[in-house]
Amino acid sequence: MINTRKNHPLMKILNESFIDLPTPSNISAWWNFGSLLGACLAIQIITGLFLAMHYTSDTSTAFSSVTHICRDVNYGWLIRYLHANGASLFFICLFLHVGRGLYYGSYTFIETWNIGILLLFAVMATAFMGYVLPWGQMSFWGATVITNLLSAIPYIGSTLVEWIWGGFSVDKATLTRFFAFHFILPFIIAAMAIVHLLFLHETGSNNPLGLISDADKIPFHPYYTVKDALGFLLMLFFFLSLVLFSPDLLGDPDNYSPANPLNTPPHIKPEWYFLFAYAILRSIPNKLGGVIALILSILILAIVPFLHNANQRSMIFRPISQCLYWALVADLVTLTWIGGQPVEHPFILIGQVASILYFSIILIFMPLATILENKLLKW
């Protein structure tokens, strides 16, 4: 008898990825976030598709089309808030997923890690362009400020900004192209996620101990399908609680005012998930320096595998590195808070100290801590 699951060309791929996949028997709940990110992407694509059916990417009608979705379309308010808060959920899962990779040394799978960094950049670009689409005050000014940063690039900066804008300011052409890119990027992200999985399945999953687990692997189904389903239900509970009880908690009130180029909001800031990078950008007085620091704040993740000089892969038995890791987490929380504050004393100074600390922990303190830990283990 032929087993279709194992012999059918298409089913075979799915079987080897989600059913008979040999998985370490000791992976914890921190390994749930990969599947949760897949669920987030599915939610975003489905809700986004329904929103795109009613949205118009024209400066004169964009804001009112979003209002129309919320007021006149059946369950339009729900679709809109699922999509807006789905982005926040996506980033919560992303940060936890990257955090888990850093803690347990998953970055030693260099190809998987690098595709992950590209995915992070793609998701950030998609979220930024999506924030512009409702054409509220913060949408317009956020787009103006962030795209204007490219003018810091020597020689070609100003031309590049005008090329992205499609004119001499953020206007109709900008909104139309942002909508086009915002629509196509999630499908590119889905394709990249498949490549991410492809590279992961070449090496197999890491585990909390950071040890080779070939001798002790179990099939993905039913053990981890059930575990992922539980994670998904828990995520859905918190997500729907946010959407149905407090949908505007993470948004900006300024975005309920239509975009007005003649009236600048007192404090321009992006969504909460970009605030840590925004704080790093603002903490450097020089424009070009700020832009470089902004890009490096994410790109620094690509250097992490080359800074790894510990005898153990995971941080689970490395207490000094653990302390530094949690200091880094606290530092990122501080940067997120600072990014949402006005540019005045003492926030400027706190932001500068937190920015220096962010780069110092990753580039200097963590490698030094691993050298010390290696010596202590020998001793």
UniProtKB/Swiss-Prot annotation:
One GO MF term: ubiquinol-cytochrome-c reductase activity
SUPFAM superfamilies: a domain/subunit of cytochrome bc1 complex (Ubiquinol-cytochrome c reductase), Transmembrane di-heme cytochromes
GO cellular component assignments: mitochondrial inner membrane; respiratory chain complex III
Cofactor binding summary note: Binds 2 heme b groups non-covalently.
Database matches in InterPro entries: Cyt_b/b6_C, Cyt_b/b6_C_sf, Cyt_b/b6_N, Cytb/b6-like_sf, Cytochrome_b, Cytochrome_b_C_euk/bac, Cytochrome_b_N_euk/bac, Di-haem_cyt_TM
Residues bound to a ubiquinone: H201
Signal sequence annotation: none
Segments crossing the lipid bilayer: 33-53, 77-98, 113-133, 178-198, 226-246, 288-308, 320-340, 347-367
Binding sites annotated in the UniProt record for heme b b566: H97, H196
Gene3D superfamilies in alphabetical order: Cytochrome Bc1 Complex, Chain C (1.20.810.10)
Residues binding heme b b562: H83, H182
Family: Belongs to the cytochrome b family.
Binding partners and assembly: The cytochrome bc1 complex contains 11 subunits: 3 respiratory subunits (MT-CYB, CYC1 and UQCRFS1), 2 core proteins (UQCRC1 and UQCRC2) and 6 low-molecular weight proteins (UQCRH/QCR6, UQCRB/QCR7, UQCRQ/QCR8, UQCR10/QCR9, UQCR11/QCR10 and a cleavage product of UQCRFS1). This cytochrome bc1 complex then forms a dimer.
Other noteworthy facts: Heme 1 (or BL or b562) is low-potential and absorbs at about 562 nm, and heme 2 (or BH or b566) is high-potential and absorbs at about 566 nm.
Function text: Component of the ubiquinol-cytochrome c reductase complex (complex III or cytochrome b-c1 complex) that is part of the mitochondrial respiratory chain. The b-c1 complex mediates electron transfer from ubiquinol to cytochrome c. Contributes to the generation of a proton gradient across the mitochondrial membrane that is then used for ATP synthesis.
PANTHER family found in the cross-reference section: CYTOCHROME B (PTHR19271:SF16)
Official protein name in the record: Cytochrome b
Organism name: Zapus trinotatus
